[in-house]
């Protein structure tokens, strides 16, 4: 349970900030103790498994828990299954199969051939986390989040009030901005609101999506 909680924390940290790669969390457990952890780096490289295993620890016989099936293909870096074998990991557990056709259902076969037990452990409460990644891989389209604020009388603005959202909804919007690559807005909306359309949350203010004005 502790490993699941730790891996869940790691996967969330860089959500929306790993470019084309999904945000993944990985923890290494040996003798019932978490000895290392990793997450996908900003811009997507290195992967979480590599970041967890690059530290100078004795990983022989350890269990690796990760949120997504380890990659099996060569890209800008070697596949994660290679370093898993090199570090002599005993068991690999992952929450979802990677829909990327270069990896889909291949990690288990490769690792099992190397006598590394690999198991898919489905975690339903993680599923929505990868909605954007799964959607992109399935339809080859970007995942779109819509922000709409409407008053009780079904108007978005009136002459008396400039904003109809509250502090909590504004925080949610800023968080969405930090997780998305770009924002589409109309020139009318920007001119009326004088919108900055950036993220103004502490620690996330460096993550500003590209702006496209319609």
Please identify what each model-predicted range represents.
Residues 22-24, 35, 144-146:
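Short loop/turn microsegments at loop-to-beta-strand junctions
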Residues 25-27, 38-39, 69, 149, ...:
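Anionic group-transfer/hydrolysis microenvironments
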Residues 56-58:
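Glycine-rich helix-loop-beta junction characteristic of Rossmann-like nucleotide cofactor-binding loops
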Residues 17-27, 61-62:
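Acidic, glycine-enriched active-site microenvironments
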Residues 1-17, 31, 60, 74-214:
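Zinc-dependent deaminase
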Residues 19-21, 47, 206:
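A generic fold-level signal
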Residues 26-30, 34-54, 122:
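N-terminal beta-alpha supersecondary unit
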Residues 24, 39, 46-47, 64-83:
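Local cysteine-cluster metal-coordination motifs and their immediate loop/turn environment
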């Amino acid at each position: 349970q502790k490993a699941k909680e730790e891996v869940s924390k790691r996967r969330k940290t860089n959500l929306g900030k790993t470019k084309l790669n999904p945000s993944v969390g990985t923890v290494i457990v040996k003798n019932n103790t978490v000895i290392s952890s990793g997450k996908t780096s900003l811009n997507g490289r290195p992967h979480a498994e590599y970041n967890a295993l690059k530290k100078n620890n004795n990983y022989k016989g350890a269990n690796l828990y990760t949120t997504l099936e380890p990659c099996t293909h060569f890209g800008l870096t070697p596949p994660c299954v290679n370093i898993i074998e090199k570090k002599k990991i005993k068991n690999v557990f992952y929450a979802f199969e990677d829909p990327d056709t270069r990896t889909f259902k291949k990690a288990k076969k490769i690792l099992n051939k190397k006598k590394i037990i690999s198991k898919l452990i489905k975690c339903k409460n993680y599923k929505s986390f990868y909605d954007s990644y799964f959607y992109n891989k399935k339809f080859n389209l970007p995942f779109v989040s819509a922000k709409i604020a409407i008053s009780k009388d079904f108007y978005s603005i009136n002459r008396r009030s400039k904003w109809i959202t509250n502090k909590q909804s504004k925080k949610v919007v800023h968080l969405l901005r930090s997780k998305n690559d770009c924002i589409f807005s109309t020139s009318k909306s920007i001119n009326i609101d004088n919108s900055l359309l950036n993220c103004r949350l502490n620690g996330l203010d460096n993550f500003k999506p590209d702006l496209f004005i319609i």
